[in-house]
Each structure stands twice: as C-alpha cells, then as structure tokens.
Regions:
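Membrane-interface aromatic/basic loop that binds lipid-linked glycans or pyrophosphate carriers
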Residues: 144-186
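Active-site-adjacent helix/loop segment of glycosyltransferases
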Residues: 63-149
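Short, flexible, basic/aromatic active-site loop/helix in glycosyltransferases
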Residues: 1-23
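Structural element of the ATP-grasp superfamily
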Residues: 38, 61, 109, 113, ...
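A short, conserved alpha-helix in the catalytic core of glycosyltransferases
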Residues: 15-19, 24-74
C-alpha cells in the first residue's frame, strides 16, 4: 500500500467511500450486477468452494465495464465466523499458512491466479510459495537463535506450511489443465 498509492495503482477494494469509486473487485457479500453483464461474463465459477471466487468473477465482469462502489449507499455486514468455528481457528483475516482453512485460502488464490492470469503466473506463484517454505525455515531458525529460543520450535508450523504447499502441488496438474473440478479441501 505504501508503494502502490504514490504510483496511483488501482485499489482492489475500498473500505469506505463518499462518492462513486472505481475498484478492481467488490466483496460478493453485497454485489449487484446487470443482467446483460451476467449474460456476457457468466456466473461465479463453480470450481471455487470458498474464497477468491468473487475476485475471479469481478475480473470477468470488469472486462464488460467498470466496477464501482457507491459511497452514498451502505449495507451492514457482520463478519462471518462460521468457518473459524468449524475449523477451530481463532485467526481473523485471510493470510494464514498452516491450517486447513489456510490451505483452502491458498488453493482458491492459486486457482484464481490460474483462471485470471494463466498458467505462467500460477506456476510462478506456486514456486514462490515453495521457495517460501525454505526461507521460512531458515529465517525462523535464525530468528529463534537470536531471540534465545529453541531454534527448532517453529518446525511444527514449517511442516504444516510445507504440507499445504505440497497439497497444492498435487493438484497443480488439474489446475493447469483448467478442466472443471470442485476444489473443496476443508
């Protein structure tokens, strides 16, 4: 954000607006789409089980015209917590790496990148996650040494992260082929 704002990178989502604001995607919790746009862009992709489906859909809708939020309208949306209760997770947000919920989030984001940007970007992202496991292992080890903690204390998280990345690798051939498949991992 500190880099994107000065170079006028479009914001993908805007938490609060007072006027009409153009965006790259809109949360599907409150989304209105014209019928003629739906006929051209299609409905939400059924390959997605949870997460990232509206981002991919908005990328197709955006090819038909602008996506905007209207600042003079409002809706009250309470944060959903059902998935956290089901998975016994206390995490808020969408940035974990270790749990089954995080695996579903990673899978959906990789699938979205494949559908939205193609095989090359999908593989680039997957290779970065794979490299990330090694980096996380080494940096975690060094950090725990410097802070005088057990240098192997983070290995449980390393293995959980690695397991999640490996699971995406097992589904990579299916994702690359881009054939219909329901990616439910929870």
């Amino acid at each position: 954000r500190w880099l994107g704002t000065p170079i006028k990178t479009p914001r993908p989502s805007v938490p609060l607006a007072s006027t009409i604001q153009e965006v790259d995607w809109i949360s599907a919790a409150f989304l209105l789409v014209k019928k003629r746009v739906l006929e051209k862009a299609g409905l939400m992709d059924e390959d997605f089980f949870l997460y990232a489906e509206e981002v991919e859909w908005c990328s197709r809708i955006g090819k038909q015209g602008k996506l905007c939020i209207y600042g003079d309208l409002s809706a009250i949306h309470l944060q959903g917590e059902a998935i956290n209760k089901d998975q016994q997770s206390n995490e808020k947000g969408y940035y974990g790496l270790y749990s089954r919920k995080d695996l579903q989030l990673m899978m959906s984001n990789h699938l979205r990148v494949r559908k939205q940007f193609g095989v090359g970007w999908f593989l680039f992202l997957l290779l970065n996650y794979t490299w990330g496991v090694l980096v996380y292992t080494i940096v975690g080890f060094i950090h725990r040494l410097i802070t005088l903690r057990n240098p192997f204390g983070h290995l449980g998280k390393v293995f959980a992260f690695g397991k999640n990345v490996f699971r995406i690798w097992t589904l990579a051939p299916t994702i690359v082929r881009n054939k219909p498949h329901f990616y439910k991992l929870l």
